[in-house]
Amino acid sequence: MREPLALVLGEDDIRALVPHPAWDTNKYARGTVGVVGGSAAYPGAPVLAASAAARCGAGYVRLVTTSGATACAHAHLLSIPVSACDQGIWGTLCATSAIQAAQDLAKSDVILVGPGMGTSDDSERFLEALSQDRPMVFDADALTLIARNHGLLDMPARHPRILTPHEGEAARLLGRKIANRNEDALQLARDYEATVVLKGPETLVATPLG
């Protein structure tokens, strides 16, 4: 395996990566994003994520959350459709709601799962039942669930996936404290067959190849 190559990206580099759609591009051609999360305790987390997806240029964003969290979503998301799914006794998504979620996310090119979804047993069963049949982004509580049960991720990976841990979540995924951010981000990428975005004062992005 070749040695990892490290690059430092500045504002100009990031700006060059932002796509500029043609004037006649429709919303579906600009990419569709499904956001899954939220619970009775954290109804606002997926709202922030869905808003961010829209602001980043996604043509169509849909939020899938619990029935108890929809009021918060409707109050803050004026142009993003919100789907309500069954919730378990802890006020989180549950295994039966995965079927509803799959139907609502059928047109999504990529799915972000995790913000505010909680770490209850119901949350774990939901994540286990959620199909990983397209590119996926795992964030927040989804990472804690994966650290607790590595079997929640399809292995080998069938589609591209991204993990977005902060150092605490990264430590849980590794099963030890972070010793070297560069090396540990690469280790995570290889262990989980994913692109890893290790957040911090200087965010690191690592792939299994470097």
What are these regions (language model features)?
Residues 1-135, 144-162, 167, 171-210:
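Small-residue (G/A/S/T)-rich helix-start motifs and N-terminal tracts that mark the onset
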